């Protein structure tokens, strides 16, 4: 637990820009981040209502710049502040190849091709704190990222925070509903 940063380049090779030297602000940017928080929270299985009720916010934690060969071996993020339940990485437009991201949880893995449309668009990846993730090496160019802690600022009365188990319950419910629908409709659509 805490803000300590690992410096072993066999594990992690990336430039970290001191937050005191960076300003990321403006109404448009704040609205963009709020929109990404809402969308990524929904994709993590958190309802839009709970995003508001729990006061889910993104707090800027790091500014990272990956050069050719830059990578981060599989790891889990540590809790960096009270209420933190996940991480949001917003990739700013920059030209690079490689640097795919793998996110794994309980034996399942998803690979994200981060260099697709990287020169002209923002991309983001969000994941719960109990997910293992890695950044594969940049093969050419530079990858520029803002790393945010996903934080609950208004915990519910039970002190329960969002976690991947909520998403698992949602998937299980959807699977049960799909199976029921297939049984009653003989698999027909329409």
Question: Where are the regions a protein language model picked out?
Answer:
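Signature of the catalytic double-stranded beta-helix
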Residues: 2-70, 76-79
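Intrinsically disordered, low-complexity regions
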Residues: 3, 14, 135, 168-171, ...
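Alpha-helical interaction elements in eukaryotic regulators
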Residues: 32-36, 40, 84, 131, ...
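Intrinsically disordered, low-complexity boundary segments flanking structured domains
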Residues: 42-53, 77, 89-90, 134-135, ...
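Catalytic core of non-heme Fe(II) oxygenases with the double-stranded beta-helix
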Residues: 56-59, 63-159
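Eukaryotic intrinsically disordered, low-complexity regulatory regions
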Residues: 153-190
């Amino acid at each position: 637990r805490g803000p300590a940063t690992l410096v072993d380049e066999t594990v992690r090779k990336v430039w970290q820009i001191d937050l005191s030297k960076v300003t990321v602000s403006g109404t448009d940017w704040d609205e963009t981040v709020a929109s990404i928080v809402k969308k990524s929270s929904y994709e993590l299985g958190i309802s839009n209502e709970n995003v508001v009720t729990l006061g889910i916010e993104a707090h800027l934690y790091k500014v990272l710049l990956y050069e050719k060969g830059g990578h981060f071996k599989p790891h889990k993020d540590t809790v960096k502040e009270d209420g933190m339940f996940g991480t949001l990485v917003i990739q700013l437009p920059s030209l690079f190849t490689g640097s795919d991201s793998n996110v794994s949880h309980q034996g399942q893995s998803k690979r994200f091709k981060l260099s697709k449309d990287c020169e002209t668009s923002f991309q983001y990846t969000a994941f719960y704190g109990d997910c293992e993730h890695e950044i594969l090496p940049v093969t050419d160019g530079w990858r520029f990222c803002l790393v945010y802690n996903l934080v609950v600022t208004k915990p519910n009365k039970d002190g329960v925070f969002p976690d991947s188990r909520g998403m698992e319950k949602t998937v299980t419910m959807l699977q049960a509903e799909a199976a029921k629908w297939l049984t009653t409709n003989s698999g027909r659509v329409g």
